[in-house]
Swiss-Prot record:
Cofactors named for this entry: Zn(2+)
Protein name: Dihydroorotase
Pathway the protein contributes to: Pyrimidine metabolism; UMP biosynthesis via de novo pathway; (S)-dihydroorotate from bicarbonate: step 3/3
GO-annotated cellular components: cytoplasm
Keyword annotations of the record: Hydrolase, Metal-binding, Pyrimidine biosynthesis, Zinc
Amino acid sequence: MRLQIKDIKIIDPLQNRDLIGDIFVENGRIVSKFLGDADKVVDGRGKIAVPGLIDIHSHLREPGEERKETIYTGTRSAAKGGITTVFCMPNTKPVIDNAPTVEFVLLKAQKEGLVNVLPIGCATKGSHGVEISEIGVLKKAGIVAVSDDGLPIANSQIMRRTLEYTKMFKLPVISHGEDKELSKNGVMNEGKNSMILGLRGIPKQAEEVIISRDIMLAELTEGYLHIAHVSTAGSVELIRQAKKKSIKVTAETCPHYFTLTDDIVKGYNTNTKMNPPLRRQEDVDAIKQGLADGTIDCIATDHAPHMEEEKNREFDLAPFGIIGFETILSLILNELVDSGVLSLSKALSKMTSNPAKIFNLEGRGTLKEGNIADITIIDMKYSYEFKKENIVSKSKNSPFIGRKFKGGAVMTIVGGNIVWQV
């Protein structure tokens, strides 16, 4: 199909482009122009075209937990949020530690997915932290990184060997920063609020101990380390110092960590329970500073769907996690861009050019001629209330229900095809 987007503001962080013009798409690729008429013309006046957003951390739950989310419902939710590519974590049932499971996810996504789905493979077999997965086989099958997400690799020797082994394949190791002994039985941030609420806390050091260790191992091995869902000021500083030493470390955070504090847990709303937990205001401020100075490279959702009956339990018993596909862009615009923490271009780079570079995604992350036509169209004046009944994810576990937003995705284009529009 030939698609023309007319008179639209184009922002492409990688190419340092910020101009008004037309975008031409033919056979799923961006072209300079084409002869003849377009099959479809989109009026872009008053809107912004950006490279398709890439979410490097999500849980699609398929195979095994389709009652919470499926590849179809998850990618539909992502498309609504302006996301054109999602990475899915391997903690499915069965876990993604073998080629057939990778192939299942890719085939299912090809048949039913609205956006691109790229699997992350288990770093260790069964995510048990004992024996390294057959990473070469997984890479050949189509993974983009390895992780035992949800679990740290507790054995330092295994983590060292994983960093050494994955270096051969230029695959990042995604680290889940949590010392399970320090966080054991904890359900929220350890501090004044946990004492007042009578809830067992998770100290910041549970995250920082593992991040510190993994940075040291990345320095030792010269492997590629990516740190997931950074939530504390101490973690930001550890990563900042590692980058100053030219250690191969990159990092992500999530919107809830630059938007909410553990004060919101006072209502015992289980949709404020996630792992890592919400921290204090000084941590929120440090996350924002880390995004501004480049310490934190990416913003991801950690989209973690759970059924209402699972969340509608005592705070102690409810599972960790919230959904995030449908709110991430608006939260970035409202919390980071509108407040002046980041320019629009720099904010967008956290979900476009930076993830594409870190995870070697050829043809994505920029609107360069010849690239895959994954495009997100934003309307900064688009106002809406995030209502439970309008959520398209199979699960509804979000702390942002009822919040009013200004600015968001109004059209999502994947491979030259319009997969969502307001």
